[in-house]
C-alpha cells in the first residue's frame, strides 16, 4: 500500500512539473547559465502584443544586463549593460543598443560595448558617476554619455 501511495505522489509531482514547463515555453530560449528574471507585460487587452523584459544578474546579485523584447518589433532586442567598480558601485551605464533576432539571450559585454561605440559614433557611449572617497560612497558628480563630458 505504501508503495502505491509513493508512486501516486511521485506521479503527481512529475505531472505538475511538466505542466509548469509547457506554460512558459518562451522562457526556455533564455540563457540558462545566467541568473535572470523574466517578465512579460501585455500591451493590449487581446493578448496579441506584449513586452518581455529579461534582467540578467552577475554572481553577486547585481543587475548586469537588461534585454527588452517586443512582440511587434521584428524580433529586435534592446540591450542595456551596466558595469561596476571594485567596491560594487555602478561605474558605467551604457546606452541601449539594438540586436536583431537574439531571442532575449544574454550578450557578452564586449559585444555590447563594441556595438554601442559603433552605433553612437563615440568612444564613451555611457554615463559615469564619480563618488566621494569615503565609506559613505555618496555620488559627487554624474557625467552624461559622450566623450564631450
Q: Which stretches of residues belong to each language-model region?
A:
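Acidic, low-complexity segments
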Residues: 4, 18-149
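Bacterial N-terminal signal peptides
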Residues: 7-15
Amino acid at each position: 500500500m505504501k508503495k502505491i501511495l509513493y508512486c501516486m505522489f511521485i506521479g503527481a509531482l512529475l505531472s505538475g512539473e511538466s505542466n509548469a514547463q509547457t506554460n512558459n515555453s518562451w522562457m526556455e530560449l533564455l540563457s540558462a547559465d545566467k541568473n535572470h528574471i523574466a517578465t512579460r507585460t501585455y500591451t493590449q487587452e487581446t493578448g496579441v502584443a506584449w513586452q518581455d523584459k529579461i534582467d540578467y544578474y552577475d554572481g553577486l546579485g547585481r543587475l548586469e544586463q537588461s534585454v527588452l523584447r517586443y512582440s511587434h518589433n521584428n524580433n529586435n532586442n534592446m540591450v542595456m549593460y551596466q558595469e561596476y567598480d571594485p567596491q560594487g558601485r555602478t561605474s558605467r551605464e551604457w546606452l541601449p543598443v539594438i540586436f536583431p533576432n537574439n531571442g532575449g539571450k544574454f550578450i557578452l559585454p564586449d559585444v555590447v560595448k563594441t556595438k554601442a561605440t559603433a552605433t553612437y559614433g563615440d568612444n564613451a557611449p555611457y554615463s559615469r558617476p564619480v563618488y566621494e572617497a569615503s565609506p559613505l560612497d555618496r555620488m559627487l558628480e554624474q557625467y552624461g554619455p559622450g566623450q564631450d563630458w
